[in-house]
Amino acid sequence: LQMVRFYSAIANDGTLVTPHFLISKPQSGEVAEWESTETGVDETVLADMRSMLRSVVTDGTGAAADIEGYEVCGKTSTAEIASEEGGYKKEVYNIGFCGFIDNSSSNLVCFVGANEVYAMRQTTQIFNDIMENAVKQYNITSMPSN
């Protein structure tokens, strides 16, 4: 959840929001409100972070997370797994992808993690599936880049 909190600050122009699990779309008239905190992070730093996270998706290991017509920003992660015999397990990793859709009507951040797997593409593809569904279900629209 700490990674989601960090990414939400980038996605929300420096406003730090505590993550919440979205179980269902709020009913009409129902408003969900949570506390937030301004971080005071410089706009230039936030723009640089978004640009770097976008390049992971456009030019790097996060390509499978991209959604046509949207600016997906995110980062893959890989961790070796300690072996009981010493050293690390061979060719199996704990992996993840955390990201958001920049320049959109949404503040959603999504983290997908998988333990003891062989391929990075699994988490990026699952992120893509989740966020494409969210785009449709919550009518998320893309906005012009700044």
What are these regions (language model features)?
Residues 1-35, 53-142:
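Active-site beta-strand/loop architecture of penicillin-binding DD-peptidases
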Residues 8, 41-45:
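A conserved catalytic-loop motif detector
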